[in-house]
């Protein structure tokens, strides 16, 4: 994989930034604990002990997402966090969404 580093940001090369086929998504879902596809987006719900833990986790994810220049859609109420990943400019789930989902799983484990 070709990776460009620009001021602390990691940006995948163009051949790594692409929309995934249904078969590729299904294959990747088998490797992503807790994720499912809903309305064309990768989705996962996480539970924490309290709001502080949920918000702390969101901050960790935000820092990693910013490095990738790829940001989640999410919704937080108290200890619950709903996360949706989709690449709007490709109109679907992309390699970036899979990479961010893996990062989120690593941070949550």
Residue ranges of each PLM-predicted region?
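Alpha-helical and His/Cys-centered functional microenvironments
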Residues: 6
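Charge-rich, low-complexity N-terminal segments
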Residues: 9-32, 38-48, 52-109
């Amino acid at each position: 994989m070709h990776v460009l580093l620009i001021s602390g940001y990691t940006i995948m090369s163009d051949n790594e930034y692409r929309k995934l086929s249904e078969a590729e998504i299904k294959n990747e879902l088998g490797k992503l604990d807790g994720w499912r596809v809903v309305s064309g987006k990768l989705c996962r719900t996480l539970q924490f002990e309290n709001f502080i833990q949920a918000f702390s986790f969101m901050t960790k994810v935000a820092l990693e997402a910013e490095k990738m220049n790829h940001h989640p859609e999410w919704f937080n109420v108290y200890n619950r966090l709903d996360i949706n990943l989709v690449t709007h400019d490709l109109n679907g789930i992309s390699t970036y969404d899979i990479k961010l989902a893996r990062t989120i799983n690593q941070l949550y484990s």
